[in-house]
Amino acid sequence: MKVINVHQRIIHQPKSAVVELFNTLASKNDLMLATHKWPAMKLDNGLTVGSKGGHGPIRYTVEAYSSGEFVQFRFSKPRGFHGFHRFDIVALDTHTTEIRHILDMHTSGFALLTWPLAIRWLHDALIDDAFDKTENHFLSQKKTTRWSAWVKFLRWLS
């Protein structure tokens, strides 16, 4: 099954401010991912091409990286995930930046069931939480995207 999953968020800050957060991805002081809610992203050599790691049961390798622009990860697990996911940081103008997460893959085997029934929902909630955390770094009134009942149920199961 072909899967393309895209999340975008407009941040009303210059790209340089957002890049400061982006550069902490997968570090002990990760300012992008909501590590208080989700497993932390860990990479054996940080944001460098060839670095291996993941978060929770999802494993991947840094396939491409351009500091301050994007990082792309190639899936290695779970079995049946054939493709990549990436974060992009795009300046829309001098004071507005778009952060984007793209997942592009084909699923096979058991992943034909696990992606649409569970992983997709958890993935979407994780990215929403990450984008909330990133945006909240710049806001006085914090934003919180609510989890669906299905996400709450899946998290309760685990």
Task: Outline where the language-model segments fall.
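Hydrophobic ligand-binding cavity/cleft-lining segments
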Residues: 1-43, 155-158
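A short, structured loop/turn motif at beta-sheet edges
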Residues: 12-16, 63-68, 88-98
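Hydrophobic pocket/interface hotspot
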Residues: 18-28, 62, 71-73, 99-101, ...
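Short beta-strand segments that buttress and anchor functional surface loops
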Residues: 46-54, 72-78
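A contiguous binding-surface segment within folded domains or other stable secondary-structure elements
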Residues: 61-63, 68-76, 80, 86
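Beta-strand/loop substructures that line and gate deep hydrophobic ligand-binding cavities in soluble
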Residues: 77-136, 140, 145-149
